[in-house]
Structures are given as C-alpha cells and as structure tokens.
Amino acid sequence: MAMNPLTVPSLPRLSGIGDIETRVILKKLARAHQALAELKGVAASMPNQSILVSTLSLQEAKDSSEIENIITTHDDLYRSDSASHHFVTLAAKEVHNYAVALRVGFEKVKRTGLLTLNDILEIQAGIEENRAGFRKLPGTALKNDKTGETVYTPPQHEGDITALMADLERFINEPGDCDWDPLTKMAVIHHQFESIHPFYDGNGRTGRVVNILYLVQQGLLDTPVLYLSRYINQHKADYYRLLQTVRETGEWEAWLLFMLEGVEQTAGQTTALVVDIKAQMQQVKHRLRSELPKIYSQDLINNLFRHPYTKIEFVASELQVTRQTAARYLDEVVALGLLSKHKRGKENFYLNDALFARLANVNSRRDEA
C-alpha cells in the first residue's frame, strides 16, 4: 500500500525485512565484488596508501557535497588547507570538513573494527561543526526542491529515532543478524539511515561516509577510496526516486541494483585513477632521481602527490628542511617541468599539473582509455 508522505512512517526493524537477494541481485553482486577486489588490490600496490587517503578523500568529499548543492572547484579545494584552517571559500571549508571527518572515521574503524553510533555522531559533528546530536524536536520533512511539496516525513519522536539508530548499530556490527552479502547490507544500511534521517543537518553526507567506512569495516576495502558519491550525483533523480519507492512499496530489487551498479562503476573508475596516479609517481621518481639526484627523496615525491597544490610550508614540514631549502627544491622541480608555480596574494602554490588534470577527470576507466 502506498504511504501518504504527510504521515509519519513506521520504519521496519532491519532483521524483519526478509529475503531480498534475488537471482538478479546475486549476479550483480558477483560483478560488484570483482570490481571492488580489483580496486583493493591496485590500491594495496601503492607504496604509500596515505597518499590515496589524503587526495581521494577530498575528491569524494567534493562529490558528496555537490549532492547537497555545496559546490566548489578543484582549484579552490586544493588551494585550501584544513590543517592551518585556511579556506579559499566557505564551500571549500565544508568539503574539507567532510574529508577530515571521513579520515578520522576511517582511522577509528581500522583501530576498533566497529562502526558505532558514537562514531556516526562524531562524523556528523565534524561535517556540520556542531554537536546537536540526533533530532529531539518534531517538524523535519523532506521536500521537493522545485515544488516545495513534502515527499517524505521521517520519524519525528526522539525515542523512535534513538531506537531505530540502535537497531541500525546492531545491524552494522553484528554479522549474525542476517546472512546477506555485505554489499547488500551496505545498500540497506544506507537506505535505513537516509529514512531515519537522524540529524537536523548533514544526513546525506554522513550517510555516504558510513557507506565507505562499512566497506572498510567488512574488509572489502583497505582504504576509503571508492567514488560512490560521484555516481549518486550523476544519477541524483534516480537515487531519490528509488529511495522513496522502497519506502512506499517495500520492493528492494531496483534500489539494490542501483547501488550495486554504483559500486561496480565507481570501483572501475577509481581503479583506473589509482593506476594512473601510480604511473605518474613512477615517472616523477625517475625524472627526479636521474635529473635532480641531490634533492631526490621518496618523501618529496609523496608530498607532490599528497598535495596537488603543494606549498613551501608543506615541504618544509614533511621533509624536515628549512623554508629556504623547501623553496629551492620546489623551484628546481618547476624548472624541470614537473610543477607549475602560481602566486596568489603573498603566497606561492606549486601545482602538480598532471595529477590535477587526472583528478578533475575521474570518470574514465582503463577499458575506455
């Protein structure tokens, strides 16, 4: 029976949903797992995976924030610096907040093996820079941006929200609850989180962080490098339509296929991106070692790929050299043609042009190259 969006829905406990892994879903799961396994293997072959966490988490943050109409350019994003609290625009600041929350959540999940309500609360607090916690007051309704029509009313009462989130926490962390594939569970977890809509703000971005961290918790990824938000952003209308279809009909197949297609597509795109970044690092390593042996170091190479826009203070800090030495290193790399130098105000930025161009075009896959 179709639900009236103006009435408060009674969301199901997750253990009571039933068997939703149809034959079509099982076939799609196999393809999605193959793509994820390839991405995991390629990422593990990187000599320093922290480079991927730093660089690709910003890319994911940008795409996830665009779903919420928080738009920033790659230029503003990479010229901003969350460590020094310098942000070119407010949008860049919000994107950096997301990336930091993702990295902090990743470190916690890797350390504990759990993804708890406290972790989710911390992620949302980092994204929104407030500690309002779960909703305590009624009145939240999701509306069509264009018409203003209410399309969905999530649970309104604090007790219901708390109970549903506790149920979600158990579902995430206790594998004995059901024998679904982890990717099926990820799609169901995401749907349930979006439907509970537990926060006043930041639900979408927090939910997409939970997606990535759940894949890490389940061992499907070692690092949070899957570009699922880009796929959702490209198919935003279908995303919201299918979320609502499950709420109204209880039919899961189309939603699961949508999310699994997203995993398969974005895993392939991200695999191609990681392969290209690794190849670029090897090329830079060869050039520096052969043409600038006096300044060559793996730490310098790591810096140039951790920060698409690097700065003198980044190099000085990470290589433990003086600012004067760091400036000389960067100018020599510029002279070699591996970086371009840009002055903004009183500050110089050094752009890794090849990396920047590749990050701005993550849609390509290796089989399309």
Task: Please provide the spans of the model-predicted regions.
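FIC/Doc superfamily catalytic core
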Residues: 1-369
